C-alpha cells in the first residue's frame, strides 16, 4: 500500500478509544471488539495510542502502550486476512526525541505504517528544535503531524514552522 495515496483518497481513520471494564481496568476483549468494529465498518485505518486512547497508557503504573499497540495490530491483521484491503495503522508517538524514537521503533515492529507525532512535550523549546525532532522521527516512520490547540494544552506555531514541518521528507499529513 502506498500510504500517501491511501491518505489522499480521503479515508476515515478514527482514533481508537481505550476500552476499560467496570473496574476501570484495560479490557482486551472489548478492545478487540472495538478494533473489529472499525475494520468491519469500512474505515481506512486506525490511529492507536493517540488522544482517544489516552496518553496515560504510557505511564509506568499503567504500562499499556505496548499491549494496546500490539493488540490492535494483531486484530487488524486477523480481520483483514479474510478480506484483504488497504488499511493504515497509525501509532501515536509522544514525548521528547528519545521516547518518541522508542515509540516509533515499537510501532514499526508491530507493522504500523505511520506515526501521529504529538509535539505537546515541547512547551517552550524553539521551533527549530521541534522541526529537528520531527525530522528524526520521520527518518524512522512516516509522520502525521498532530497540532494540539492551545485551548487544550498545545501552543501556537508560526507559519515558518509549518512550512519547515511540511518540507520534512517523510511527513505525509498533518492532523489539525
Provide a role label for each language-model segment.
Residues 151, 175-176:
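Short, surface-exposed loop/turn motifs that are enriched in glycine and acidic residues
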Residues 1-159:
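Active-site beta->alpha loop and helix N-cap motifs at the rims of alpha/beta catalytic domains
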Residues 163-175:
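Active-site/ligand-binding-proximal alpha/beta "capping" segment
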Amino acid at each position: 500500500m502506498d500510504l500517501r495515496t491511501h491518505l489522499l483518497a480521503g479515508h476515515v481513520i478514527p482514533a481508537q478509544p481505550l476500552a476499560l471494564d467496570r473496574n476501570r481496568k484495560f479490557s482486551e476483549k472489548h478492545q478487540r471488539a472495538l478494533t473489529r468494529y472499525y475494520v468491519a465498518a469500512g474505515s481506512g485505518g486506525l490511529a492507536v495510542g493517540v488522544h482517544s486512547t489516552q496518553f496515560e497508557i504510557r505511564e509506568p503504573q499503567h504500562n499499556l502502550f505496548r499491549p494496546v499497540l500490539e493488540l490492535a495490530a494483531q486484530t487488524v491483521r486477523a480481520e483483514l486476512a479474510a478480506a484483504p484491503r488497504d488499511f493504515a495503522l497509525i501509532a501515536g508517538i509522544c514525548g521528547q526525541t528519545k521516547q518518541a524514537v522508542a515509540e516509533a521503533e515499537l510501532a514499526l515492529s508491530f507493522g504500523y505504517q505511520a506515526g501521529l507525532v504529538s509535539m505537546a512535550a515541547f512547551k517552550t523549546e524553539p521551533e527549530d528544535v521541534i522541526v529537528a525532532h520531527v525530522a528524526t522521527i520521520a527518518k524512522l516512520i512516516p509522520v502525521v503531524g498532530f497540532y494540539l490547540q492551545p485551548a487544550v494544552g498545545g501552543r501556537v506555531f508560526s507559519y515558518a514552522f509549518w512550512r519547515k514541518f511540511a518540507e520534512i521528507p517523510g511527513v505525509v499529513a498533518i492532523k489539525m
